[in-house]
């Protein structure tokens, strides 16, 4: 099954410039920024606190100063995720962004230094805008991915190796979901 209505809509979206976007959202555009797009995985034994501590340590080790988090769905684990962000011993400034809409979401992903998470947009929409991302967890397992998507386990070593590969990769590849019923 190929095709994605979201991807088809994303093709037509004009991205906002970084200054306007960050100013509108009252964010500091000069900080090294990671955009975390994470949805809890249903039917999974995902330890939110353990894995977020690893991600936070990875970001700290790579001098990220700001973590922007897209609002999560209501699947099991989302309350723990939000609680960790609000109550955890964060070594990094974070902001939860809600209701971005597709234009701001794609613009944010384009203008930050790193996009990491497990959302289906990593498979469909982000590659259309030539946005590279680190895909964590098995939430998108079985879906065809492009060279824009870098799979990683949530360990310091694997995240670092994946990030290093992402930074040096410049190739643009074909888009697997641009077949059959799509443009």
Name these PLM-found stretches.
Residues 1-183:
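Nucleotide-activated sugar donor-binding and catalytic core shared by glycosyltransferases
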């Amino acid at each position: 099954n190929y095709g994605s209505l979201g991807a088809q809509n994303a093709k037509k979206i004009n991205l906002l410039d970084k200054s306007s976007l960050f100013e509108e959202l009252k964010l500091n555009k000069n900080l090294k920024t990671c955009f975390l797009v994470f949805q809890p995985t249903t039917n999974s034994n995902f330890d939110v606190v353990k894995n977020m501590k690893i991600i936070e340590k990875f970001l700290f080790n790579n001098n990220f100063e700001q973590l922007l988090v897209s609002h999560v769905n209501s699947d099991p684990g989302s309350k723990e995720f939000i609680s960790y962000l609000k109550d955890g011993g964060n070594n990094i400034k974070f902001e939860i962004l809600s209701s971005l809409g597709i234009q701001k979401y794609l613009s944010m992903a384009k203008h930050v230094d790193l996009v990491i998470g497990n959302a289906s947009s990593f498979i469909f929409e982000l590659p259309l805008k030539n946005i590279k991302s680190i895909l964590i967890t098995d939430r998108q397992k079985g879906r065809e991915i492009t060279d824009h998507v870098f799979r990683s386990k949530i360990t310091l070593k694997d995240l670092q190796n994946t990030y290093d590969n992402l930074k040096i990769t410049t190739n643009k590849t074909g888009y697997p979901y641009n077949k059959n019923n799509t443009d």
